[in-house]
């Protein structure tokens, strides 16, 4: 997964995951991440697919997991979330353009959904994640390891293997 997460890239990633899961639900699949994030709803669709497939999904960050891509990075199977030593996890404040109160509530719901999901997969609670998003915090791989965002940090060899 490289570049912005869009509706199109999410559809492609989800289709590949469902195909691999149908082929062999016991074989792990690896999702390599170097993305600044992107469309919130598309990211949530990928997250839902990761939670749905029976095959373990290993996540490997090489470069940046920014914005919404952080959720994909932390959603990998426990013990199988890796990052290269120079990887960066970069929170961003969600920016929405809305004109109605209902749209504003939906935006707040999306931010809360991201914060809660990231909190479930890390050592941070929902409020701490929301604060990190609001402050646009950055974490290098070793800090991400200490905070429970990743299970292993190392060199490029962490990116080998998987389907």
Where are the predicted features?
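Terminal-region recognition feature
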Residues: 1-163
């Amino acid at each position: 997964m490289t570049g912005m997460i869009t509706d199109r890239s999410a559809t492609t990633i989800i289709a590949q995951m469902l195909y691999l899961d149908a082929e062999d639900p016991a074989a792990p699949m690896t999702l390599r991440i170097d993305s600044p994030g992107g469309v919130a709803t598309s990211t949530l669709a990928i997250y839902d697919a990761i939670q749905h497939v029976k095959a373990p999904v290993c996540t490997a960050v090489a470069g940046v997991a920014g914005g919404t891509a952080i959720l994909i990075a932390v959603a990998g199977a426990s013990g199988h979330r890796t990052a290269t030593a120079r990887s960066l996890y970069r929170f961003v404040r969600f920016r929405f353009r809305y004109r109605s109160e209902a749209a504003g509530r939906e935006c707040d719901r999306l931010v809360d959904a991201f914060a809660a999901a990231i909190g479930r997969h890390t050592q941070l609670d929902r409020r701490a994640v929301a604060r990190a998003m609001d402050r646009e915090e950055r974490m290098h791989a070793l800090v991400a390891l200490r905070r429970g965002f990743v299970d292993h940090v190392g060199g490029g060899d962490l990116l080998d293997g998987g389907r």
